[in-house]
Amino acid sequence: MAEKNMETIVNLAKHRGFVFPGSEIYGGLANTWDYGPLGVELKNNVKRAWWQKFVQQSPYNVGLDAAILMNPKTWEASGHLSNFNDPMIDNKDSKIRYRADKLIEDYMHAQGDEHFIADGMSFDEMKQFIDEKGIVCPVSGTANWTEIRQFNLMFKTFQGVTESSTNEIFLRPETAQGIFVNYKNVQRSMRKKLPFGIAQVGKSFRNEITPGNFIFRTREFEQMELEFFCKPGTEIEWQEYWKNFAAKWLKDLGIKEENTKLRDHDEDELSHYSNATTDIEYKFPFGWGELWGIASRTDFDLKAHMAASGDDFSYHDQETNEKYVPYCIEPSLGADRVTLAFLCDAYEEETLEGGDSRTVMRFHPALAPYKAAILPLSKKLSPDAMKVYEALSADFAIDFDESQSIGKRYRRQDEIGTPFCITFDFDSLEDNQVTVRDRDTMEQVRMPISEVKAFLDEKIKF
């Protein structure tokens, strides 16, 4: 089997309608991507699977859809206006700007220290490290650097007809703050007792200087976040619970265990508000990358908004007659990143008996863009085969493919990850049965048309 690389994944994604470069007819816009017909189905299935397990089937959690634009005081209280910065450094010869921490990490990873993290270093420490190690610009090959400066990652815009500081607002850099400011609304309206969680799926925006690796790091991205509120003193137990819950979700949807690892943050790596954080990392073709962060945020966010707004977010525990501000566990997952992980994990080039080969995307059926494809053996059979399509498409995403030979159609469906091909042949007119081919095993079984829906229902469960 050929080794996976990002170029192969990106090419397949474009060729088969998963992901296209953004604004391509105008030369594109750096690091923007549009999800094509199959990509939007895949990503929607990922979001649906997350919502199913984290909200629909959870007795603890409820959902929210907060506005992207928020009162700027939100970002003052959360610390994003003052602290949401990247350390930037420019090479004077190439005129290219880099994140200083990423320059250092890339250098150390190349030296063999795969787990080196520069998060805890001050600007002075990073500059001293770059100078002492003689780290050079990848483009110019020189070490002619500027001093390190802060660069705020928030996208700024204006509300109303005039562009003045009084009308200044921001595109949200995370979905979490919309949850925190609605904590009391949700808790009271839904009559929730601790522990409980508020989940949200939505777009966020960060003016990253060094985005890259396809849809792994982009300036516009989608998050699937849960803020889980609990009694202080129980947060480590719940952080462990959600860490394991998240890892199981990935495994149940087919992510290979050898391609994931759980990494606990060292004490000097923790954010100032966190007392425990675990990253679930995935082994992408370009290396290990963070997929999911599960952080114990303590009571930092609720207290910050209490102080800034004057509202009281404390909780009265009727069982113990205590009053306290809840602690919060945040499992935060990037929808685009995990979609990329599913693309990479599913991709396989398989050599078959007789020397033939095929490309197959082994998506879990719950995630596959199409659950099945209806393939009439002859175009003469298309009207009758279409009746099967119409019956199934009320409940499933189904493809209808009548062009080229049956073998080429099988290969095409394998390459887009369709789990089952349903062939309607001339015998189907007489016996009301179809042939169902399994994508992974390529085995075929004859089945009554009346049983196909129940068959697909069972197969897409996870």
Curated annotation (Swiss-Prot):
EC number assigned by the record: 6.1.1.14
Gene3D superfamilies: 3.30.40.230, Anticodon-binding domain, Bira Bifunctional Protein, Domain 2
Transmembrane segments: none
PROSITE patterns given in the database record: AA_TRNA_LIGASE_II (PS50862)
Residues given in the record as ATP binding sites: 206-208, 216-221, 290-291, 334-337
Chief localization: cytoplasm
Annotated InterPro entries: aa-tRNA-synt_IIb (IPR002314), aa-tRNA-synth_II (IPR006195), aa-tRNA-synth_II/BPL/LPL (IPR045864), Anticodon-bd (IPR004154), Anticodon-bd_dom_sf (IPR036621), Gly-tRNA_synthase/POLG2 (IPR027031), Gly_tRNA_ligase_bac (IPR022961), GlyRS-like_core (IPR033731)
Annotated signal peptide: none
Example GO BP: glycyl-tRNA aminoacylation
Binding, substrate: R99, E174, F221, E222, Q223, M224, E225, E330, P331, S332, L333, G334
Subcellular location: Cytoplasm
Pfam family membership, one: HGTP_anticodon
GO cellular component: cytoplasm
Keywords: Aminoacyl-tRNA synthetase, ATP-binding, Cytoplasm, Ligase, Nucleotide-binding, Protein biosynthesis
Molecular functions per Gene Ontology: ATP binding; catalytic activity, acting on a protein; glycine-tRNA ligase activity; protein dimerization activity; transferase activity
Chemical reaction(s) catalysed: tRNA(Gly) + glycine + ATP = glycyl-tRNA(Gly) + AMP + diphosphate
Function: Catalyzes the attachment of glycine to tRNA(Gly).
Similarity comment: family membership: Belongs to the class-II aminoacyl-tRNA synthetase family.
NCBIfam families from the UniProt entry: glyS_dimeric, PRK04173.1
Assembly with partners or alone: Homodimer.
Protein name according to UniProt: Glycine--tRNA ligase
Organism: Macrococcus caseolyticus (strain JCSC5402) (Macrococcoides caseolyticum)
